[in-house]
Amino acid sequence: MNAAVKALHENDYLVADLSLAAWGRKEIRIAETEMPGLMAIREEFAAKQPLKGARVTGSLHMTIQTAVLVETLQALGAQVRWASCNIFSTQDHAAAALAVQGTPVFAYKGETLADYWDYTHRIFEFGAAGTDGEGPNMILDDGGDATLLMHLGKRAEKDLSLLDNPKSEEETCLYAAIRAKLAVDPTWYSRKGAQIIGVTEETTTGVHRLKEMSAAGTLLFRAINVNDSVTKSKFDNLYGCRESLVDGIKRATDVMIAGKVACVAGYGDVGKGSAQALRALSAQVWVTEIDPINALQAAMEGYKVVTMEYAADKADIFVTTTGNRDVIRHEHMAAMKDQAIVCNIGHFDNEIDVASLEGYEWDEIKPQVDHIIFPDGKKIILLAKGRLVNLGCATGHPSFVMSSSFANQTIAQIELFCHPDGYDVGKVYVLPKHLDEKVARLHLKKVGAMLTELTDDQAAYIGVPKNGPYKPDTYRY
């Protein structure tokens, strides 16, 4: 090993504090007992090494549960480089536990945006410093930032003017990072992108980006939409948020939720779980919706369906769950009660118009908890600066539900890497139903569930295979 390569491997990580590694390892061991899907996949595939030769760039919240995912990919033969997909979501002891084992991980809680985009670049560098080296051949993404970086960077190689007019602080930092990279290596993005077989995407927002690029004919590689696996969206998005939302609010504020009016913006899977959690603690839950079907669902569940304009001066707690921008705008916050709590559990920070508050006085109560003081002296409490409250102010979803999501991710990585000819470049796929059902089966024993088996006559009568899949793709669950 030459000196340059040796130096790269010896320093190929950036975490907050390596002394936290032992603590992180203890929590990883506990999480493994709660993640039967990933552990079963290790047992099934470790000897076969289906990911041998895979170089996986991972951009996903660097939590204890993610550490179990990373080590599952490695157990199946993959090389992995990892960064968080959110500046506040890293658990520093989890990152340290991976780093001391030799995993190149670049993440700390409370990153600057400049650091965030620097680290997102670093996870594409599998080769020795100072050489072209190898890039990844797989991306595991959450929110689509790693995928976006490759696509925007490649386009900017031909037209730097694409970077001339950033519309947010996030874009300002992203565009600056791309300009800096192109200044020293004008073909870096196209070289790295050319090696990528495909991407597996974790969340609704990232899938939306992929579908837009696919429809426009600009998606550079194959993609599997993990989010729309039933055992992801109907479990992680619903049951995960049902537990982690109130965990974040409680840790941040110690507020009594019972008796409060809580306004949940959006009634998709995340909104449903959030509304259930708040109602379980005896809040009066109101819902805002644009979709008449979702609005009717909320009403039939007993929630009051209102507009944000109606709720703004009446509710005590506001939660955005939509994946859209400007859901809570300045005029809404200006109308809110003194000490209203405002937070977001959608992927990006633009659901709440935080930028409109920058000219006001901010008083940090503690990390990720701020009083925003309006000119009339009124204060609202903003959590995680409008980013994911469950990861910014708490530790995210429980291990068990993340086992289901991450089992889908691992299976999707195996599918794309081992069978790329079955997937067209530029198209977005979901995993087939039998694999979705497999993920569910892997988790039944842990919760003590007993599965009824069809008889031959029953299977013939309803026209399904005895061992599944049991439902058509159109079934909504």
Curated annotation (Swiss-Prot):
The enzyme's main class, written as a single word, is hydrolase
Q: Name one GO cellular component term.
A: cytosol
Q: Where does substrate bind?
A: T63, D142, E202, K232, D236
Please provide the record's keywords in A-Z order. Answer: Cytoplasm, Hydrolase, NAD, One-carbon metabolism
Q: Does the keyword Cytoplasm apply?
A: yes
Protein's pathway: Amino-acid biosynthesis; L-homocysteine biosynthesis; L-homocysteine from S-adenosyl-L-homocysteine: step 1/1
This entry's comment on the bound cofactor is:
Binds 1 NAD(+) per subunit.
Which branch of life, at top level? Answer: Bacteria
For biological process, the GO terms are: L-homocysteine biosynthetic process; one-carbon metabolic process; S-adenosylmethionine cycle
Q: Which residues bind NAD(+)?
A: 203-205, 237, 266-271, 289, 324, 345-347, 390
Query: Can you state which reaction this protein catalyses?
Result: S-adenosyl-L-homocysteine + H2O = L-homocysteine + adenosine
Localization, UniProt: Cytoplasm
Cofactor(s), by name: NAD(+)
**Pfam families hit by this protein:** AdoHcyase (PF05221), AdoHcyase_NAD (PF00670)
Could you tell me the EC number(s) of this protein?
A: 3.13.2.1
Q: Which InterPro entries match?
A: Adenosylhomocyst_ase-like_sf, Adenosylhomocysteinase-like, Ado_hCys_hydrolase_NAD-bd, NAD(P)-bd_dom_sf, S-Ado-L-homoCys_hydrolase_CS
List the SMART domains. AdoHcyase (SM00996), AdoHcyase_NAD (SM00997)
Q: Which molecular function terms from Gene Ontology are attached?
A: adenosylhomocysteinase activity
Describe its function: May play a key role in the regulation of the intracellular concentration of adenosylhomocysteine.
HAMAP family documented for this protein: AdoHcyase
Sorted alphabetically, which NCBIfam families does this protein's record hold?
ahcY (TIGR00936), PRK05476.2-3 (NF004005)
Its family remark reads: Belongs to the adenosylhomocysteinase family.
Full protein name = Adenosylhomocysteinase
| UniProt gene name | ahcY
